[in-house]
Amino acid sequence: MSDRRLSPTELRDALNAIGAERYHNLHPFHRALHDGALAQGQVQAWALNRYYYQSRIPAKDATLLARLPTADLRRAWRSRLDDHDGSAPGQGGVARWLKLAEGVGLDRAYVESTAGILPGTRFAVDAYVAFVRDRSILEAIASSLTEMFSPTIIAERVSGMLAHYPFVTQDTLAYFTPRLTQAPKDVDFALTYIDEHARTRALQEGVLAALRFKCDVLWSQLDALHYAYVEPGRIPPGAFVPEPA
């Protein structure tokens, strides 16, 4: 590896290359979800397990917020908490995800309890929260850059699920509409911070490694779902069991 610092354009190209290879829109479970190949119970398993990820994002963001050294940075990052937790009960991304889970036929209290999630889901999400808590601020912010690729997966997911699943409506998928504007805003902040603070090639490599780690977090959640609910279909003890189709 050369010690030469990458230009902003070169760094973005390297980040995009990671997404093109590793982002979870490429996972077989997501391909099946978007192509209408899953039964309702499998869609429920996805919504249930994804809730744990959604519910821990505000905790992850609050952990980083406490570490940011300036008021300007804290104000910018605080908007993520508002996006996910909302400013009142029933608002924000977590509440909208609960609405999605109810829309595909799950009981709200059961989803909120997280009692039925897969161990692999819990381990992956908790590892992400710990990463943001324990690694450098630069790496923590860089790990959020999977949002660079989220508009593509949102478009695929919304169009595919509406086309293939009669139990899914536009209202069910309301979570995704605000993300189309929130995610680019968050990406702009993260890239600006990285351009200013990743001043050496070694720091830039840390940025790239953080994005790879986050892609692994997302991919491993889908590995767990695929193993439990698709092939070979071995659901761990205590995890959600769909009703027979």
Question: Predicted regions: what is each one?
Answer:
Residues 2-245:
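Non-heme di-metal
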